[in-house]
Amino acid sequence: MRVALCALPDVREATRMCLSTLPRPAAPPPPEVIRAPIWTTWARYKQNVDQEKTLTFAREILRHALPASVMEIDDKWQAGYGELDFDLTKFPDPKGMVDELHALGFAVTLWVMPFVEEDTEAFREGSELGYFVTSKRRTGNLKPGFFKWWNAPPVVALDVTNPEAVDWFVTRLKRLQTRYGIDGFKFDAGEPCFLPRMFETREALGHPSEYTRYWVERVASRFALAEVRTGHGTTGVGVLTR
């Protein structure tokens, strides 16, 4: 083990010295995610979110003379985890909603994660193409390859070491942007602790945390307005880490 000892005048100088050894992004995250609050539906409604509540939330923000910055539509906007399209029962006119939020001055982002539940078209398509992390061992009483993530149904994980799988996922996100005018995404999860026991990826990982690095570098970095909650060796990626 190598141990480096530093002697500097104060904590600020020590921090600056340490930061100087890390990669820096070519550009910072967009100003709108730093200078003003990110208004997330999760803080107000948790999973009980829909189109009318989202618009009501935005109008209340403006009525209280607070800044219109980023409106982040969080968990349960999809019909199923990983579908990457709106639940039309809860959001009957997604394009109209996004247009109205834009007119009010908000940028609009959506919550996404690299996990897909079984009872979805995304799972059927991705499974046929071999786009998910696999496992020959069960996690508890779940099917091989499946695991529990928070309070979601059992899910599988996108294989971020597989370039075709990454392109498939990113293409579906960009389709959302084109169809509805979405400005960016909140990229949740990405930690290897959620993955199934004895998991296998197309490209072998040097250590499990490389899954996190690939999630940020290969997916989140493809979008100008991106927020992540985790990172590993990704200080050079110009995304907001919350």
Identify the residue ranges that each predicted region occupies.
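Carbohydrate-recognition beta-sandwich/jelly-roll modules
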Residues: 1-69, 95-100, 104-108
